[in-house]
């Protein structure tokens, strides 16, 4: 379990003989400057920036229960997914958090095709897949894209 080196409190024996599950394909962002470079070259896509840390239980819940939902995955295919891993809480991590006035993870910031943050679309704390689909619908509406249906 966790005492044997498992890092996920929801799956303390993960990796102990079972294949690892597929993870959401986030591009890691390590600094504010790197984020600006990526946003400038995002080719008109909506961008999602997920603030994550290994010690953040709600972050693990988002990965396990929300991001893994096929309906969420379908919406992710239409976005550029970025992740700022602030586990180390170093100067670059703190600068990124401060830039978006976040105290820590979990926090998700969305940017429109123009590279600017989409006002009123931040997700702070855990959201179930159902609630997150509603949040993604708001993001798409603000970005001028077709609305997302929450129900299958």
Language model regions located:
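Proteins that catalyze or organize thiol-disulfide redox chemistry
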Residues: 1-80, 84-152
């Amino acid at each position: 379990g966790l005492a044997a080196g498992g890092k996920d409190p929801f799956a303390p024996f993960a990796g102990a003989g079972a294949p690892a599950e597929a993870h959401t394909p986030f591009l890691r962002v390590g600094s504010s400057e790197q984020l600006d470079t990526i946003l400038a070259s995002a080719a008109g896509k909506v961008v999602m920036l997920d603030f994550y840390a290994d010690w953040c239980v709600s972050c693990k819940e988002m990965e396990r229960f929300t991001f893994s939902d096929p309906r969420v995955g379908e919406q992710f295919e239409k976005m550029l997914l970025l992740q700022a891993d602030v586990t180390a809480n170093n100067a670059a991590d703190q600068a990124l958090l401060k830039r978006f006035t976040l105290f820590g993870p979990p926090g998700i910031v969305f940017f429109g095709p123009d590279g600017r943050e989409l006002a009123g679309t931040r997700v702070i704390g855990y959201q179930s897949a159902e609630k997150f689909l509603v949040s993604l619908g708001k993001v798409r509406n603000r970005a001028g894209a077709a609305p997302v249906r929450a129900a299958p």
